[in-house]
């Protein structure tokens, strides 16, 4: 039996709406499982605050002020300011899905030879596209910048770069997402300070007095914005 012209007229708009809905779902769906949002130039994911761990001294063996964001199950998570609900690999995949290529400039010697004054590896600077890091705090209309959160006695500030360093992930399994120095374990690191600077104590990052972060265990959202 042939369909009437009127019935075909009703079906065409319905099919068009269905197709549009499928297309919208494909575009808006997060491309990396566990990531809250992957936009045109942004990646956003949840994390919890752990200020005490970030600033803790452990008889000279800790790493206070070094690890900004670490996957909550990574080896370096006990020293991080923010413990991410997603893995460092997920964040790396999400950033690469936006079309940017990481610098991949730092090998393991950058860290392993940090106490060797004759080695140039610890003086290397992280390379890659610039990344702005923002922290969304519940109840605040605008996200916080790193400069609003952290105190930097060295005064050089922040130049965060998408280093990548995928090849180093299985060597450390640290879960590091962001380090505040040019670290081979970081996916994003700070080009203003090297591992040598860490050894020398050029600066020691701390949370600013009065920084409007939630109490330890409180949730925030981390935004990586490619410039």
Walk through the language-model features, giving the residues of each.
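Hydrophobic alpha-helical membrane-insertion segments, chiefly the h-region
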Residues: 17-26
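N-terminal Sec-pathway targeting helices
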Residues: 3-16
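Long, low-hydrophobicity ectodomains and other hydrophilic envelope-associated domains
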Residues: 28-227
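Intrinsically disordered, low-complexity sequence elements enriched in Ser/Thr/Gly/Pro
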Residues: 1-6, 27-29
């Amino acid at each position: 039996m042939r369909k009437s012209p009127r019935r075909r007229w009703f079906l065409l708009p319905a099919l068009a709406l269905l197709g549009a809905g499928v297309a919208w779902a494909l575009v808006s769906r997060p491309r990396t499982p566990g990531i809250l949002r992957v936009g045109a130039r942004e990646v956003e994911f949840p994390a919890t605050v752990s200020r005490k761990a970030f600033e803790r001294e452990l008889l000279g063996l800790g790493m206070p002020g070094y690890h900004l964001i670490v996957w909550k199950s990574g080896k370096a998570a006990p020293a991080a300011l923010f413990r991410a609900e997603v893995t460092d690999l997920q964040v790396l995949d999400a950033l690469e899905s936006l079309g940017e290529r990481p610098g991949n400039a730092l090998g393991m010697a950058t860290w392993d030879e940090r106490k060797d004054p004759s080695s140039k590896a610890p003086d290397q600077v992280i390379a890659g596209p610039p990344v702005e890091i923002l922290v969304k705090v519940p109840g605040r209309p605008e996200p916080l910048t790193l400069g609003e959160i952290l105190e930097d006695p060295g005064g050089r500030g922040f130049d965060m770069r998408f280093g990548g360093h995928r090849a180093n992930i299985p060597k450390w399994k640290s879960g590091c997402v962001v380090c505040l120095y040019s670290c081979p374990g970081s996916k994003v690191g700070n080009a203003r300070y090297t591992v040598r600077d860490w050894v020398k104590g050029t600066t020691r990052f701390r949370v600013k007095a009065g920084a409007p972060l939630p109490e330890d265990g409180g949730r925030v959202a981390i935004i990586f914005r490619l410039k």
